[in-house]
Amino acid sequence: MQQQQQPKVKLSKKDYIEKKEKEQQLLNNNNKVNREKDGKIMIEKNLQEKQDDILMNEKKKQQSGLGIDKTFTLVINTLGHLEKKNDLDQYWVLNNKEYHLSFITFLPADNNEQGSSEESILFMNSDLSSLLKFQYNIFWSHCIFNKSLNEFIDSFLKFFKRDNQPIISLVNNNSVNNNNNNNNSIIKKGSKDFNESKKLLFKRVFLVLVRMSLQQEKSGFITREFYSDLIYKNKLFTIPKLFDIVSLYSSHARDAVTTMIQSIFDTQPNYYKDLLQHFQLISKTLFELNQSLLNRNLLDLLRLEDNYLMDIVYNLEQFIRIFPMGSHQLFDEYLMNLEKGGGDGNGGVLGWLTYFYEYIIPIFNKENQKASNKQVNLTPSIYVPLKQHILSIFHTIFRHHFMIKLEQLQLLIQDPCQLCKKLPLDEISHRFFSLLGNITSFSQQIIGSTKSNRSKLFNEYFDNITSASILYDYEQTYKLSNFLDKLVTLDSSIDFTSYTYFMQLIGKPVSQDQKQIQKPKFKKSTTIIDSNISSSSSSSSSSSPSNATTTVKPILSNNPVIMNTVKIDQVKSLFPDLGDWFVHCCLKYYNQDVEQVINALCDDSSLPPHLKSMDRSLSSDPSQPSKNIPTPTTTTTTTTTTDKPNNTTTATTTTTTTTSSSKSLEKSMNELNISIGYEKIYDEKYDDSLEEFSGFSVQDGEKYNDEDEDEKKDSENNTNTEDQKHPTTSASGRTPNESNNLGRPRQNNPNKGRKEDNRNNKQQTHSSHHSQPQQQQQQQPPQHQPQPHQQPQQQPQPHQHQQPQQQQPQQPQHKQQPKPQQSKQHPQQQPKQQPKQQPQQPKQQSQQQPKQHPQPQQPQQPQPQPQPQPQQQQQQQQQQQQQQQQRQPQQPQQPQPQQQNQQQNQQQNQQPKKSQNDDKPKPDKKPKGSYSKGGSVGGGR
């Protein structure tokens, strides 16, 4: 009825229109929501597709194996489209806000906590931390296109305060002491937060420099050619920068700095040319400094400080020590300028350093001492640091160009330096003596050339002052005379007059006796060398000396060397892993100075290249294989050839001595390496059981129990609840856990029954008259639990070891008497033969021990037997019947009351354990058959 009345209701036009509008609005809203959803879905799909394309591009880059200089990255621009951007582009620095960084410069005031220095260091740390987190291509984009980064690094390397460089003031001594006290560490002034932030800045700058020196990382790499041009053209690394890096970080990260400098010079050889130009610039500044000082009538100490003389010397010394290959440019620059003429100001860095060392610094030092009363304090503060650094510069040059060359010729080692060329011995000695002559003559040339330009004051100074000889001071520190003697002994072409002149110059004059001794060395050196060569090459050692002297050539060979064992032992006391020959070479290089050798071994970077490349475990000269330790096989062959008894005895003694000496050497080497012998304990075969740990067999584990526990277990066996306790405790008194732990080794001892029977049979003839029955009682209880179907006296071992017992009864027959052999064979026979042979044993016992026979057999009746299963009861009853049949002729000898039986049970249960404690450790420590000498008699007693 209601449905029929609805059409009759008429809506007004207005209501109808509103209704339609609402319906239309709902449709529009639904369509809008659907469109928005569809739009979002489409946008997400597009983004996902673009991200997939970006990931695919990254995978292709990794698979292509191209450097970042040849690859690009897909980027979504502002319009939502993909756009290609090179991996090295300004986009990553300027246009991208995510990777934008702007650095501020480091000022000298930032070394101290003043004003805004703390805030500026915080900004620097935050920018450096974000830079180090960037990917490889973004990091390199900042290095190339971000100028603020390069300006920051340059300012930091220039103005950051050095920690190890001694800043010397030639004007005031108080400032010297203050500066030296402040140079012990990087930061000492300021609060803790400021010092920590400054140390963090110091580390992060170094990490940035190290990353700039790396050509390859996990996230990418740069091709070698592009990288070499990149760092050189963009001036990411320059020679002044490298000098500053070495002076700042060489004392903190020496190995990292050496690898960084070496890799930079290897990738870009143009830096060698720049290094030569840099040395020429240093020599020019020293020339100008000398001219400005000599033209004045006053000692301008401030001018000497403002020209950074100490800074130049310190940086040069540190750089050459870190990078010895740079000494080639320094030495070549010196030789080039000497050819042009040293007096015109082009003498090279080495010439000007000798001039300042011998004349300028002593003049200023002397006048400064006159001006102040503290003469003692001024001398070390001004003169000594410069002296040490200048001498170190000359030592690195001598070592790299001459000393190492000579060692390489002697040891036949290939030259590791790429720039060095192999030179003969004559050329090495000629260059070295010419260098010494030029060093001594250059200062005189400068003094003669500048005589007209000097002021009257300096003319007086040069006339009155006594110059310091740089070679004499070098002799006091590095022992130049040892190297000169070595050259003279090896090379006969050296002029002896020049040798005596330089020896007198360094304070080592050659006497007339030494001259007479020295002259034959020139001729004998070559003959000795050639004789050694001929003797080593020929199979027989009986070559005539005339043949050896025919080939006279200045060739080096492995001469017989006498090693200083005392100094070698001193070095090996701190470094026991080193070989004698390696330590000998180190002592030879450092002029037999043990302290220098130890310091060099502590810092491996200070070792010369030929010692680094040498095997440190060498104990003898590798070039002389004939001098090895004789093996015993060579001496044993001599014994077979000889017929006389005397000869044979001597030959045999030599073999024993060589073998004993070789064994003693092996023992001493093993004792030095304690860790090797100690680690052998923890191999796979190591057993941590009680038997291995204690040294006793597991069968003797009962003696580790206390006597109180043994008495408790014996009392429990005699109580009325014995039948209920046997399932939980074994017949030997152990718990199930102990029986499980100790049951495994018992199966591994199949000869246990025979050993115990041997002891029982010996005790019948040697020991007391009541020991054997007590041991038989202890053997019976553990036999019922594992195998209840066997008789208690037939087989003391489990059923698994019947076969090895049948195969091994013949071993003790040769060492023991015939009576114990019969007793051994009884428990090892098969069960069918055992009932016939078993009554023989109690008959023997009754004959020898008729009075004490009833004691051991009484406890067998009250002792309970395990009843783990009802099926075993019939077998146990059969065993009891067999035992009673065996004991029938002995039953009339047992008329004793029950109280005596209980006392005897307790005594008998205690006595076998005491005898067991005394008897059983001995067979475990001795080999088989050792009981034949009566080893168990003492234990039975």
UniProtKB/Swiss-Prot annotation:
Region annotated Disordered, chain positions: 531-553, 612-665, 695-941
Entry GO CC: nucleus
Disulfide linkage: none
Localisation: Nucleus
Annotated TM spans: none
Principal localisation: nucleus
Stretches with biased composition (Polar residues): 616-629, 727-751
InterPro entries the UniProt entry points to: ASCC2 (IPR052586), ASCC2_CUE (IPR041800), CUE (IPR003892), UBA-like_sf (IPR009060)
Keywords: Coiled coil, Nucleus, Transcription, Transcription regulation
Coiled-coil parts of chain: 16-64
An annotated Gene Ontology molecular function: ubiquitin binding
CUE domain boundaries: 563-606
Biased composition (Low complexity): 531-551, 630-659, 762-855, 870-914
Chain intervals with Basic and acidic residues compositional bias: 712-726, 915-927
Keyword Transport: no
Biological processes per GO annotation: rescue of stalled ribosome; ribosome-associated ubiquitin-dependent protein catabolic process
Family: Belongs to the ASCC2 family.
General function of this protein: Enhances NF-kappa-B, SRF and AP1 transactivation. Involved in activation of the ribosome quality control (RQC) pathway, a pathway that degrades nascent peptide chains during problematic translation.
Descriptive protein name: Activating signal cointegrator 1 complex subunit 2 homolog
Source organism of the structure: Dictyostelium discoideum (Social amoeba)
Annotated gene: ascc2
